[in-house]
A protein has these predicted regions:
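Residue-level signal for inorganic ion chemistry
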Residues: 52, 95
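Catalytic strand-loop segment that frames the active site of acyl-thioester-processing enzymes
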Residues: 8-50
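Short amphipathic alpha-helical face segments that pack within enzyme cores
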Residues: 53-61
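Hydrophobic beta-strand-centered segment that forms part of the acyl-chain substrate-binding groove
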Residues: 60-94, 104
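Short boundary/loop segments of OB/S1/cold-shock single-stranded nucleic-acid-binding domains
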Residues: 2-4, 84
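Hydrophobic residues in beta-strands and at strand termini
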Residues: 33, 81, 125-127
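HotDog/MaoC-like acyl-thioester-processing domains
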Residues: 14-26, 87, 96-128
């Protein structure tokens, strides 16, 4: 998986720590977005925030880590951004996985900082 990651996908993967499974069957990890995160380049100078597309991508990349399979995003069925994530913040990413059909996964991703919802996304991803 690492060899085929996009630059941002690899950056996101390298920032995932404390991966664990909850009693409810969801998966959680923490992610540190220090100022060296490449997603901040040009987004926005002087006030860097994590781009929304990176937050959606984090859900897919985390699902790959959990499933140990390479995935490609087929669709984003729902997405809501509620609060930006700034340089220096640590986020918690939680995903719920459901195999909709063979090799097609529904991913529900929820990203929070200090308990506050930053983004929620529902995507479908296929095994490559």
């Amino acid at each position: 998986m690492d060899g085929k990651d996009s630059i941002i996908g690899g950056e996101l993967r390298s920032r995932m720590a404390d991966i664990r499974r909850t009693e409810e069957g969801q998966y959680v990890c923490s992610m540190a977005f220090d100022p060296s995160f490449r997603g901040f380049e040009g987004h926005f100078p002087g006030n860097p925030i994590v781009p929304g597309v990176c937050l959606i991508e984090a859900g897919r990349v985390f699902a790959e880590e959990v499933l140990k399979r390479e995935l490609t995003t087929r669709s984003v069925t729902q997405c809501r951004f509620r609060r930006p994530i700034f340089a220096g913040e640590r986020a918690e990413l939680k995903i719920k996985l459901e195999e909709e059909e063979k090799n097609l996964w529904k991913i529900q991703a929820d990203i929070r900082v200090d308990g506050n919802v930053c983004a929620q996304a529902r995507l479908k991803a296929a095994v490559l």
